[in-house]
Design a protein with these regions (language model features):
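Conserved SAM-binding motif I beta-strand of class I
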Residues: 76-81
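Conserved class I S-adenosyl-L-methionine
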Residues: 52-61
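Conserved beta-strand signature within the Rossmann-like core of class I S-adenosyl-L-methionine
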Residues: 144-155
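Central antiparallel beta-sheet cores of small beta-barrel/beta-sandwich binding domains
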Residues: 188-282
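Glycine-rich SAM-binding Motif I of class I
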Residues: 63-67
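Active-site capping/gating segments
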Residues: 153-195
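S-adenosyl-L-methionine
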Residues: 19-53, 84-117
């Protein structure tokens, strides 16, 4: 008879193994479906891949997208793929196309891979996995990083561009010829509370700027300690920040650039113009 303590340890071990297997299965981001070459071409064009880019393909399969980025645009690239046989196939393809010095293929979980180096991210994953990546993209990727998602949007994030096309050869692969590409530019992280400084001619007192930033919306208000004044039509694209403000009857237009915990730029109003600065305090 197996002692109770040993049986309990064995049961715990089996449970842990089963849990690990379940977690690994949960992170298999869909079956391998090769992207037709015409779509590879359009994804690279939409991302405006350049020689100074580092292109990450999450779920890279046979590596064709990363290899094409290196061969056609001299970009560097990283492919992340869970299946070892596909990783080896991609490495062989890189050697054959003479770009092995510019690309690397990593066997690993794309949900745990460090992606901070990327300036371009490509993905062709099932919707539930795409949505899991949205918080990571917004939190970890540098402002200005471009993302192209094949067929599935990064909900609830709104794309900067969309491209639709009919690709007959895709029907034999995935059952449909209709293709959609979604293009995103990672915005600077501007949410929080800021000390806002304006020219004295526009605001004589210190102001507080409070910004709320979500994947599908950004906005906020300015407070002088007594009254709140809401921002108008705020947009954040890469590091570029724009918004309007009606402050005590004076309509002002702000343009600027975010850099970490500081922002600065120009402000215009009928009564004058000048520069503005902001420093994040929390």
């Amino acid at each position: 008879m197996i002692p109770r303590s040993v049986a309990a340890a064995l049961a715990l071990g089996f449970a842990s193994h089963a849990l690990a297997q379940a977690e690994a299965k949960d992170n298999i981001a869909g079956p391998y479906v090769p992207t037709p070459w015409v779509i590879v071409d359009e994804m690279l064009k939409l991302a405006d891949v350049r020689a100074d880019d580092v292109v990450y393909d999450l779920g890279s399969g046979d590596g064709r997208l990363v290899i094409a980025a290196a061969k056609r645009y001299q970009a560097r690239g990283v492919g992340v793929e869970l299946q070892p046989e596909l990783v080896e196939l991609a490495r062989s393809g890189a050697k054959k196309e003479d770009v092995a010095d510019r690309v690397k293929f990593v066997q690993g979980d794309l949900f745990e891979t460090d992606i901070r180096e990327a300036s371009v991210v490509m993905l062709y994953l099932l919707p539930q996995f795409v949505m899991r990546l949205v918080p990571r993209f917004l939190a970890e990727l540098r402002p200005g990083t471009r993302i192209v998602s094949h067929d599935y949007p990064l909900l609830p994030w709104r794309p900067d561009k969309e491209l639709s096309m009919d690709v007959p050869e895709k029907e034999f692969i995935s059952g449909t010829s209709w293709t959609r590409l979604f293009y995103y530019v990672v915005p600077a992280r501007v949410g929080g509370v800021w000390d806002l400084s304006l020219p004295k001619a526009l605001a004589g007192a210190p102001l507080m700027l409070q910004i709320t930033q979500e994947p599908d919306a950004v906005g906020g208000l300015v407070s002088d300690g007594r009254d709140d004044f809401y921002l108008r039509d705020m947009t954040v694209r890469a590091e570029q920040v724009r918004f309007g403000l009606l402050y005590k009857g004076r309509l002002m237009a702000f343009e600027g650039k975010a850099a970490g915990d500081t922002m600065s730029g120009s402000v215009r109003a009928r009564s004058g113009s000048g520069t503005w600065t902001a420093r994040r305090v929390k």
